[in-house]
Amino acid sequence: MSEEIQLVGEKNELGESISPQLPSEVKNFLIDIDGTITDDVPNEEPERMVTCLPYPDALETMAKWYDEGHVLTFFTSRTEEHREVTEIWLKKHSIKYHGLLMGKPRGGNYHWIDNHIVRATRFE
């Protein structure tokens, strides 16, 4: 489920954005799935991916962010073989989003290195 995001920035001769940027008021959220918006379901138990329920507060918050025009991309440790069940689950629970990235390495020792400020939030 993806919606076109309006980007700002200079255009090339074809009218395409060069190094596109989000407007300053738009946040770009990168959200984990398991243990963050639903119970922690390991890849070894894919049958639970179908039946787990999203956390109500997470549903409300993500819907608000999406409706406010922010970008929601899920970044999950689920593998590509879990993509279809994950997309079905997101649709079943009416979770709107812009992108789904699979294959995040498991573990909690994440470091994001960028030339811009990166803000990390623990979603509780």
Place the predicted regions along the sequence by residue.
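HAD-like aspartate-dependent phosphatase fold
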Residues: 1-124
